[in-house]
Curated annotation (Swiss-Prot):
This is UDP-N-acetylmuramoylalanine--D-glutamate ligase. Gene3D superfamilies: Mur ligase, C-terminal domain, Mur-like, catalytic domain, NAD(P)-binding Rossmann-like Domain. Its main location: cytoplasm. One of its GO terms (cellular component) is cytoplasm. It is found in: Cytoplasm. Keywords: ATP-binding, Cell cycle, Cell division, Cell shape, Cell wall biogenesis/degradation, Cytoplasm, Ligase, Nucleotide-binding, Peptidoglycan synthesis. Pathway: Cell wall biogenesis; peptidoglycan biosynthesis. GO terms for biological process: cell division; cell wall organization; peptidoglycan biosynthetic process; regulation of cell shape. Disulfide bonds: none annotated. It comes from Neisseria gonorrhoeae (strain ATCC 700825 / FA 1090). ATP binds at G117, S118, N119, G120, K121, T122, T123. It comes from the Bacteria. Cell wall formation. Catalyzes the addition of glutamate to the nucleotide precursor UDP-N-acetylmuramoyl-L-alanine (UMA).
Amino acid sequence: MTFQNKKILVAGLGGTGISMIAYLRKNGAEVAAYDAELKAERVAQIGKMFDGLVFYTGRLKDALDNGFDILALSPGISERQPDIEAFKQNGGRVLGDIELLADIVNRRGDKVIAITGSNGKTTVTSLVGYLCIKCGLDTVIAGNIGTPVLEAELQREGKKADVWVLELSSFQLENTESLRPTAATVMNISEDHLDRYDDLLDYAHTKAEIFRGDGVQVLNADDVFCRAMKRAGREVKRFSLEHEADFWLERGTGCLKQGNEDLISTQDIPLQGLHNAANVMAAVALCEAVGLPREALLEHVKTFQGLPHRVEKIGEKNGVVFIDDSKGTNVGATAAAIAGLQNPLFVILGGMGKGQDFTPLRDALKDKAKGVFLIGVDAPQIRRDLDGCGLNLTDCVTLEEAVQTAYAQAEAGDIVLLSPACASFDMFKGYAHRSEVFIEAFKAL
Protein backbone atom coordinates (compact mmCIF):
# COMPACT_ATOMS: atom_id res chain seq x y z
CA MET A 1 0.00 0.00 0.00
CA THR A 2 1.48 3.31 -1.06
CA PHE A 3 0.62 6.67 0.45
CA GLN A 4 2.77 8.94 -1.69
CA ASN A 5 0.69 11.91 -2.86
CA LYS A 6 -2.39 10.53 -1.08
CA LYS A 7 -4.52 12.99 0.85
CA ILE A 8 -5.66 11.33 4.08
CA LEU A 9 -7.95 12.53 6.86
CA VAL A 10 -7.36 10.90 10.25
CA ALA A 11 -10.57 11.02 12.31
CA GLY A 12 -10.35 10.69 16.08
CA LEU A 13 -7.35 12.08 17.89
CA GLY A 14 -6.76 9.67 20.74
CA GLY A 15 -3.79 7.32 20.89
CA THR A 16 -4.78 5.37 17.78
CA GLY A 17 -5.36 8.51 15.73
CA ILE A 18 -2.02 10.01 16.75
CA SER A 19 -0.22 6.78 15.80
CA MET A 20 -1.89 6.79 12.37
CA ILE A 21 -0.85 10.40 11.75
CA ALA A 22 2.75 9.56 12.67
CA TYR A 23 2.87 6.43 10.52
CA LEU A 24 1.17 7.95 7.48
CA ARG A 25 3.32 11.09 7.56
CA LYS A 26 6.45 8.98 7.77
CA ASN A 27 5.30 7.12 4.67
CA GLY A 28 4.74 10.17 2.51
CA ALA A 29 1.04 10.91 2.88
CA GLU A 30 -0.48 14.37 3.08
CA VAL A 31 -2.31 14.05 6.40
CA ALA A 32 -4.93 16.21 8.11
CA ALA A 33 -6.63 15.64 11.47
CA TYR A 34 -10.30 15.66 12.47
CA ASP A 35 -12.22 15.42 15.72
CA ALA A 36 -15.84 16.35 16.36
CA GLU A 37 -14.77 18.52 19.27
CA LEU A 38 -11.32 20.04 19.59
CA LYS A 39 -10.13 22.20 22.45
CA ALA A 40 -7.37 24.73 21.79
CA GLU A 41 -5.10 22.98 24.29
CA ARG A 42 -5.40 19.68 22.40
CA VAL A 43 -4.70 21.36 19.06
CA ALA A 44 -1.59 22.99 20.53
CA GLN A 45 -0.44 19.70 22.05
CA ILE A 46 -0.79 17.74 18.81
CA GLY A 47 0.56 20.64 16.75
CA LYS A 48 3.83 20.44 18.67
CA MET A 49 4.15 16.81 17.59
CA PHE A 50 3.40 17.40 13.89
CA ASP A 51 4.54 20.62 12.23
CA GLY A 52 2.04 22.13 9.81
CA LEU A 53 -0.75 19.65 10.59
CA VAL A 54 -4.15 20.94 9.44
CA PHE A 55 -7.07 20.42 11.84
CA TYR A 56 -10.78 20.10 11.13
CA THR A 57 -13.64 20.00 13.63
CA GLY A 58 -17.43 20.20 13.60
CA ARG A 59 -19.28 18.18 10.95
CA LEU A 60 -17.29 15.32 9.42
CA LYS A 61 -18.90 15.97 6.03
CA ASP A 62 -17.45 19.46 5.91
CA ALA A 63 -13.97 18.05 6.49
CA LEU A 64 -14.40 15.27 3.91
CA ASP A 65 -15.45 17.81 1.28
CA ASN A 66 -11.81 18.94 1.05
CA GLY A 67 -10.76 16.31 -1.49
CA PHE A 68 -9.47 13.45 0.67
CA ASP A 69 -8.62 10.08 -0.90
CA ILE A 70 -8.65 8.08 2.33
CA LEU A 71 -10.45 8.38 5.67
CA ALA A 72 -8.46 6.73 8.48
CA LEU A 73 -10.89 6.07 11.33
CA SER A 74 -10.13 5.62 15.00
CA PRO A 75 -12.09 2.69 16.50
CA GLY A 76 -14.45 4.91 18.47
CA ILE A 77 -15.98 6.34 15.29
CA SER A 78 -18.48 4.15 13.45
CA GLU A 79 -18.32 4.14 9.67
CA ARG A 80 -22.06 3.45 9.65
CA GLN A 81 -23.08 7.06 9.19
CA PRO A 82 -24.36 8.88 6.11
CA ASP A 83 -21.34 11.16 5.67
CA ILE A 84 -18.96 8.19 5.53
CA GLU A 85 -21.27 6.11 3.32
CA ALA A 86 -21.40 9.01 0.86
CA PHE A 87 -17.60 9.33 0.96
CA LYS A 88 -17.24 5.64 0.04
CA GLN A 89 -19.83 5.86 -2.73
CA ASN A 90 -17.83 8.72 -4.22
CA GLY A 91 -14.70 6.56 -4.41
CA GLY A 92 -13.13 7.30 -1.04
CA ARG A 93 -11.49 4.52 0.95
CA VAL A 94 -12.10 3.95 4.67
CA LEU A 95 -9.62 2.04 6.82
CA GLY A 96 -8.22 1.83 10.34
CA ASP A 97 -4.92 1.15 12.03
CA ILE A 98 -5.31 -2.65 11.90
CA GLU A 99 -5.68 -2.52 8.11
CA LEU A 100 -2.51 -0.44 7.93
CA LEU A 101 -0.66 -2.97 10.10
CA ALA A 102 -2.02 -5.84 8.00
CA ASP A 103 -0.36 -4.34 4.94
CA ILE A 104 2.95 -4.21 6.83
CA VAL A 105 2.94 -7.75 8.24
CA ASN A 106 1.66 -9.27 4.99
CA ARG A 107 4.63 -7.80 3.10
CA ARG A 108 7.13 -8.66 5.81
CA GLY A 109 5.88 -12.13 6.75
CA ASP A 110 5.37 -11.62 10.51
CA LYS A 111 3.14 -14.20 12.20
CA VAL A 112 -0.04 -12.88 13.82
CA ILE A 113 -2.20 -14.28 16.61
CA ALA A 114 -5.48 -12.36 16.70
CA ILE A 115 -7.95 -12.47 19.59
CA THR A 116 -11.44 -11.05 19.99
CA GLY A 117 -14.65 -11.84 21.86
CA SER A 118 -17.13 -10.16 24.15
CA ASN A 119 -15.27 -11.34 27.25
CA GLY A 120 -11.86 -12.74 28.09
CA LYS A 121 -9.99 -11.26 25.14
CA THR A 122 -7.66 -9.09 27.23
CA THR A 123 -6.76 -11.97 29.55
CA VAL A 124 -6.17 -14.32 26.61
CA THR A 125 -4.10 -11.71 24.76
CA SER A 126 -1.95 -11.12 27.83
CA LEU A 127 -1.54 -14.85 28.47
CA VAL A 128 -0.67 -15.62 24.84
CA GLY A 129 1.85 -12.77 24.78
CA TYR A 130 3.35 -13.97 28.06
CA LEU A 131 3.67 -17.54 26.76
CA CYS A 132 5.25 -16.43 23.48
CA ILE A 133 7.81 -14.30 25.32
CA LYS A 134 8.58 -17.09 27.80
CA CYS A 135 9.14 -19.46 24.88
CA GLY A 136 11.71 -17.08 23.41
CA LEU A 137 9.81 -15.38 20.60
CA ASP A 138 10.33 -11.72 19.72
CA THR A 139 6.75 -10.76 20.56
CA VAL A 140 4.69 -7.61 20.11
CA ILE A 141 1.52 -7.33 22.23
CA ALA A 142 -0.71 -4.55 20.93
CA GLY A 143 -4.14 -3.44 19.78
CA ASN A 144 -7.19 -2.93 21.96
CA ILE A 145 -5.15 -4.08 24.98
CA GLY A 146 -3.50 -0.68 25.22
CA THR A 147 -0.63 0.02 22.81
CA PRO A 148 -1.86 1.08 19.34
CA VAL A 149 -0.42 -1.25 16.72
CA LEU A 150 1.20 1.50 14.66
CA GLU A 151 2.80 3.00 17.75
CA ALA A 152 4.35 -0.41 18.39
CA GLU A 153 5.45 -0.66 14.75
CA LEU A 154 7.08 2.77 14.81
CA GLN A 155 8.91 1.90 18.03
CA ARG A 156 10.36 -1.18 16.31
CA GLU A 157 11.54 0.94 13.36
CA GLY A 158 10.40 -1.65 10.84
CA LYS A 159 12.04 -4.66 12.50
CA LYS A 160 10.24 -7.92 11.77
CA ALA A 161 8.67 -9.63 14.80
CA ASP A 162 8.43 -13.37 15.38
CA VAL A 163 4.78 -12.87 16.30
CA TRP A 164 2.26 -10.09 16.84
CA VAL A 165 -0.33 -10.85 19.53
CA LEU A 166 -3.29 -8.60 18.82
CA GLU A 167 -6.38 -7.93 20.88
CA LEU A 168 -9.00 -6.70 18.43
CA SER A 169 -12.35 -5.12 19.21
CA SER A 170 -15.34 -5.37 16.91
CA PHE A 171 -14.81 -1.67 16.18
CA GLN A 172 -11.30 -2.39 14.87
CA LEU A 173 -12.55 -5.25 12.70
CA GLU A 174 -15.22 -3.15 10.98
CA ASN A 175 -12.80 -1.70 8.44
CA THR A 176 -10.12 -4.42 8.39
CA GLU A 177 -10.02 -6.48 5.20
CA SER A 178 -6.42 -7.60 4.67
CA LEU A 179 -5.44 -9.15 8.02
CA ARG A 180 -4.68 -12.87 7.64
CA PRO A 181 -3.83 -14.19 11.12
CA THR A 182 -1.72 -17.30 11.55
CA ALA A 183 -4.21 -18.24 14.26
CA ALA A 184 -7.27 -16.45 15.60
CA THR A 185 -10.10 -16.86 18.07
CA VAL A 186 -13.46 -15.37 18.94
CA MET A 187 -13.71 -16.27 22.62
CA ASN A 188 -17.48 -15.82 22.92
CA ILE A 189 -20.39 -13.63 21.88
CA SER A 190 -22.68 -11.90 24.38
CA GLU A 191 -24.63 -8.67 24.38
CA ASP A 192 -22.29 -5.70 24.06
CA HIS A 193 -22.14 -2.51 21.99
CA LEU A 194 -25.74 -2.95 20.83
CA ASP A 195 -25.88 0.83 20.67
CA ARG A 196 -23.56 0.48 17.62
CA TYR A 197 -24.87 -2.68 15.91
CA ASP A 198 -28.30 -3.63 14.56
CA ASP A 199 -28.55 -6.74 16.74
CA LEU A 200 -26.49 -9.55 18.26
CA LEU A 201 -26.11 -11.33 14.91
CA ASP A 202 -24.77 -8.17 13.28
CA TYR A 203 -22.26 -7.87 16.15
CA ALA A 204 -21.24 -11.54 15.76
CA HIS A 205 -20.74 -11.15 12.00
CA THR A 206 -18.35 -8.28 12.65
CA LYS A 207 -16.37 -10.36 15.17
CA ALA A 208 -16.13 -13.22 12.65
CA GLU A 209 -14.13 -11.00 10.28
CA ILE A 210 -11.08 -11.95 12.37
CA PHE A 211 -11.10 -15.32 10.54
CA ARG A 212 -10.17 -13.98 7.09
CA GLY A 213 -7.40 -15.94 5.39
CA ASP A 214 -6.45 -19.58 5.93
CA GLY A 215 -5.05 -19.62 9.48
CA VAL A 216 -6.02 -21.88 12.37
CA GLN A 217 -9.44 -21.19 13.87
CA VAL A 218 -9.74 -21.62 17.65
CA LEU A 219 -13.45 -21.87 18.43
CA ASN A 220 -15.51 -21.95 21.62
CA ALA A 221 -17.59 -25.11 21.25
CA ASP A 222 -19.96 -23.94 24.00
CA ASP A 223 -21.02 -20.77 22.15
CA VAL A 224 -23.62 -21.13 19.38
CA PHE A 225 -22.35 -18.05 17.54
CA CYS A 226 -18.73 -19.20 17.66
CA ARG A 227 -19.60 -22.70 16.48
CA ALA A 228 -21.21 -21.17 13.40
CA MET A 229 -18.00 -19.31 12.50
CA LYS A 230 -16.21 -22.44 11.20
CA ARG A 231 -14.99 -21.88 7.65
CA ALA A 232 -14.60 -24.61 5.05
CA GLY A 233 -11.14 -26.04 4.49
CA ARG A 234 -9.63 -24.58 7.65
CA GLU A 235 -7.82 -26.24 10.55
CA VAL A 236 -10.08 -25.86 13.60
CA LYS A 237 -9.30 -26.35 17.29
CA ARG A 238 -12.31 -26.34 19.63
CA PHE A 239 -12.35 -25.81 23.39
CA SER A 240 -15.16 -26.59 25.81
CA LEU A 241 -16.09 -26.42 29.48
CA GLU A 242 -19.15 -28.63 28.88
CA HIS A 243 -18.15 -31.66 26.81
CA GLU A 244 -15.25 -33.42 25.09
CA ALA A 245 -13.51 -31.38 22.39
CA ASP A 246 -9.97 -30.81 21.12
CA PHE A 247 -9.36 -29.03 24.45
CA TRP A 248 -11.84 -29.63 27.26
CA LEU A 249 -12.39 -29.53 31.00
CA GLU A 250 -13.08 -32.82 32.76
CA ARG A 251 -15.38 -31.55 35.50
CA GLY A 252 -14.99 -34.51 37.83
CA THR A 253 -11.21 -34.22 38.07
CA GLY A 254 -10.77 -30.50 37.34
CA CYS A 255 -8.25 -31.44 34.66
CA LEU A 256 -7.82 -29.71 31.31
CA LYS A 257 -7.42 -32.32 28.59
CA GLN A 258 -6.53 -32.54 24.93
CA GLY A 259 -8.50 -35.47 23.62
CA ASN A 260 -7.73 -38.20 26.16
CA GLU A 261 -4.45 -36.65 27.30
CA ASP A 262 -4.25 -34.83 30.65
CA LEU A 263 -2.76 -31.36 30.25
CA ILE A 264 -2.95 -29.45 33.53
CA SER A 265 -5.07 -29.37 36.68
CA THR A 266 -7.10 -26.23 37.30
CA GLN A 267 -5.51 -26.25 40.77
CA ASP A 268 -2.17 -25.50 39.08
CA ILE A 269 -3.57 -22.48 37.22
CA PRO A 270 -3.21 -19.22 39.20
CA LEU A 271 -6.21 -17.63 37.44
CA GLN A 272 -9.49 -17.95 39.35
CA GLY A 273 -12.80 -19.09 37.90
CA LEU A 274 -14.04 -21.57 35.31
CA HIS A 275 -13.98 -18.92 32.60
CA ASN A 276 -10.21 -18.77 33.03
CA ALA A 277 -9.98 -22.49 32.28
CA ALA A 278 -11.48 -21.62 28.89
CA ASN A 279 -9.00 -18.77 28.53
CA VAL A 280 -6.08 -21.12 29.18
CA MET A 281 -7.31 -23.69 26.66
CA ALA A 282 -7.71 -21.04 23.97
CA ALA A 283 -4.28 -19.57 24.70
CA VAL A 284 -2.52 -22.94 24.49
CA ALA A 285 -4.29 -23.76 21.22
CA LEU A 286 -3.29 -20.41 19.70
CA CYS A 287 0.33 -20.77 20.79
CA GLU A 288 0.59 -24.32 19.46
CA ALA A 289 -0.66 -23.00 16.12
CA VAL A 290 2.49 -20.88 15.77
CA GLY A 291 4.71 -23.84 16.61
CA LEU A 292 5.31 -23.51 20.36
CA PRO A 293 5.80 -26.77 22.33
CA ARG A 294 2.93 -27.84 24.56
CA GLU A 295 5.08 -28.97 27.51
CA ALA A 296 6.76 -25.56 27.80
CA LEU A 297 3.44 -23.74 27.39
CA LEU A 298 1.83 -25.65 30.25
CA GLU A 299 4.76 -24.97 32.58
CA HIS A 300 4.58 -21.25 31.84
CA VAL A 301 0.78 -21.18 32.37
CA LYS A 302 1.51 -22.05 36.00
CA THR A 303 3.43 -18.80 36.50
CA PHE A 304 0.98 -16.37 34.84
CA GLN A 305 -0.62 -14.24 37.53
CA GLY A 306 -3.34 -12.60 35.48
CA LEU A 307 -4.43 -8.99 35.15
CA PRO A 308 -5.68 -6.36 37.57
CA HIS A 309 -9.42 -5.61 37.80
CA ARG A 310 -10.41 -9.05 36.45
CA VAL A 311 -11.87 -11.27 39.19
CA GLU A 312 -9.01 -10.22 41.45
CA LYS A 313 -9.15 -10.68 45.22
CA ILE A 314 -8.23 -7.34 46.75
CA GLY A 315 -8.57 -8.24 50.42
CA GLU A 316 -10.56 -9.75 53.25
CA LYS A 317 -12.14 -8.24 56.36
CA ASN A 318 -13.67 -10.32 59.15
CA GLY A 319 -13.94 -13.27 56.81
CA VAL A 320 -15.67 -11.31 54.03
CA VAL A 321 -13.71 -11.49 50.75
CA PHE A 322 -13.71 -8.54 48.33
CA ILE A 323 -13.20 -9.27 44.62
CA ASP A 324 -12.59 -6.68 41.91
CA ASP A 325 -13.95 -7.40 38.44
CA SER A 326 -14.26 -3.79 37.31
CA LYS A 327 -13.32 -4.92 33.78
CA GLY A 328 -16.63 -6.81 33.69
CA THR A 329 -18.30 -4.22 31.48
CA ASN A 330 -21.04 -6.37 29.93
CA VAL A 331 -23.58 -8.98 30.97
CA GLY A 332 -21.58 -11.93 29.66
CA ALA A 333 -18.46 -10.95 31.60
CA THR A 334 -20.40 -10.57 34.84
CA ALA A 335 -22.24 -13.86 34.34
CA ALA A 336 -18.88 -15.60 33.81
CA ALA A 337 -17.42 -14.02 36.95
CA ILE A 338 -20.42 -15.13 39.02
CA ALA A 339 -20.31 -18.66 37.58
CA GLY A 340 -16.63 -19.01 38.49
CA LEU A 341 -17.10 -18.19 42.19
CA GLN A 342 -18.44 -20.70 44.67
CA ASN A 343 -19.23 -18.74 47.85
CA PRO A 344 -22.41 -16.71 48.50
CA LEU A 345 -22.20 -13.32 46.80
CA PHE A 346 -23.14 -9.70 47.28
CA VAL A 347 -22.83 -8.21 43.79
CA ILE A 348 -22.40 -4.56 42.81
CA LEU A 349 -23.88 -3.79 39.37
CA GLY A 350 -24.41 -0.66 37.32
CA GLY A 351 -23.06 2.16 35.20
CA MET A 352 -23.67 2.81 31.49
CA GLY A 353 -25.52 -0.19 30.10
CA LYS A 354 -24.80 0.39 26.38
CA GLY A 355 -28.27 -0.83 25.37
CA GLN A 356 -27.86 -4.29 26.92
CA ASP A 357 -30.59 -6.60 28.17
CA PHE A 358 -29.75 -7.51 31.79
CA THR A 359 -32.30 -10.32 32.15
CA PRO A 360 -29.67 -13.07 31.56
CA LEU A 361 -28.24 -12.11 34.96
CA ARG A 362 -31.43 -13.36 36.64
CA ASP A 363 -30.35 -17.00 36.27
CA ALA A 364 -26.71 -16.24 37.04
CA LEU A 365 -27.60 -14.45 40.29
CA LYS A 366 -30.58 -16.34 41.67
CA ASP A 367 -28.72 -19.33 43.14
CA LYS A 368 -25.64 -17.44 44.37
CA ALA A 369 -26.46 -13.83 45.24
CA LYS A 370 -27.62 -12.87 48.71
CA GLY A 371 -27.94 -9.25 47.62
CA VAL A 372 -27.45 -6.95 44.63
CA PHE A 373 -26.45 -3.28 44.89
CA LEU A 374 -27.21 -0.96 41.98
CA ILE A 375 -25.24 2.16 41.03
CA GLY A 376 -24.98 4.46 38.04
CA VAL A 377 -27.15 5.93 35.33
CA ASP A 378 -28.69 2.64 34.18
CA ALA A 379 -29.48 1.29 37.65
CA PRO A 380 -33.24 1.76 36.99
CA GLN A 381 -33.08 -0.41 33.88
CA ILE A 382 -31.14 -3.14 35.72
CA ARG A 383 -33.77 -3.04 38.48
CA ARG A 384 -36.55 -3.48 35.91
CA ASP A 385 -34.75 -6.39 34.22
CA LEU A 386 -34.04 -8.17 37.53
CA ASP A 387 -37.27 -7.32 39.35
CA GLY A 388 -39.45 -10.22 40.41
CA CYS A 389 -36.77 -12.93 40.45
CA GLY A 390 -36.45 -13.05 44.23
CA LEU A 391 -33.28 -11.00 44.54
CA ASN A 392 -32.80 -8.33 47.19
CA LEU A 393 -32.05 -5.20 45.13
CA THR A 394 -30.65 -2.06 46.81
CA ASP A 395 -30.10 1.29 45.08
CA CYS A 396 -26.93 3.15 46.10
CA VAL A 397 -25.88 6.67 45.14
CA THR A 398 -22.15 5.92 45.13
CA LEU A 399 -19.84 2.93 44.85
CA GLU A 400 -18.59 3.69 48.35
CA GLU A 401 -22.14 3.40 49.69
CA ALA A 402 -22.58 0.08 47.89
CA VAL A 403 -19.39 -1.31 49.45
CA GLN A 404 -20.39 -0.17 52.93
CA THR A 405 -23.93 -1.54 52.64
CA ALA A 406 -22.80 -4.87 51.22
CA TYR A 407 -20.23 -5.33 53.99
CA ALA A 408 -22.84 -4.51 56.64
CA GLN A 409 -25.03 -7.35 55.35
CA ALA A 410 -22.28 -9.90 54.68
CA GLU A 411 -21.12 -12.71 56.96
CA ALA A 412 -17.80 -14.53 57.19
CA GLY A 413 -17.38 -16.67 54.09
CA ASP A 414 -19.35 -14.33 51.83
CA ILE A 415 -17.92 -12.47 48.83
CA VAL A 416 -18.51 -8.85 47.87
CA LEU A 417 -18.05 -8.77 44.09
CA LEU A 418 -17.72 -5.64 41.97
CA SER A 419 -18.67 -6.83 38.48
CA PRO A 420 -20.77 -3.99 37.10
CA ALA A 421 -21.83 -5.42 33.69
CA CYS A 422 -21.63 -1.80 32.51
CA ALA A 423 -19.22 0.81 31.25
CA SER A 424 -17.93 3.25 33.85
CA PHE A 425 -17.91 6.68 32.23
CA ASP A 426 -21.07 7.97 33.92
CA MET A 427 -19.28 8.04 37.29
CA PHE A 428 -15.59 7.34 36.67
CA LYS A 429 -12.71 8.08 34.30
CA GLY A 430 -12.64 4.42 33.26
CA TYR A 431 -12.82 0.90 34.66
CA ALA A 432 -9.39 1.28 36.31
CA HIS A 433 -10.57 4.39 38.17
CA ARG A 434 -13.72 2.52 39.23
CA SER A 435 -11.48 -0.22 40.59
CA GLU A 436 -9.39 2.30 42.53
CA VAL A 437 -12.52 3.71 44.18
CA PHE A 438 -13.65 0.17 45.08
CA ILE A 439 -10.28 -0.62 46.66
CA GLU A 440 -10.24 2.63 48.64
CA ALA A 441 -13.79 1.96 49.86
CA PHE A 442 -12.69 -1.48 51.05
CA LYS A 443 -9.69 -0.04 52.86
CA ALA A 444 -11.93 2.52 54.58
CA LEU A 445 -14.17 -0.15 56.18
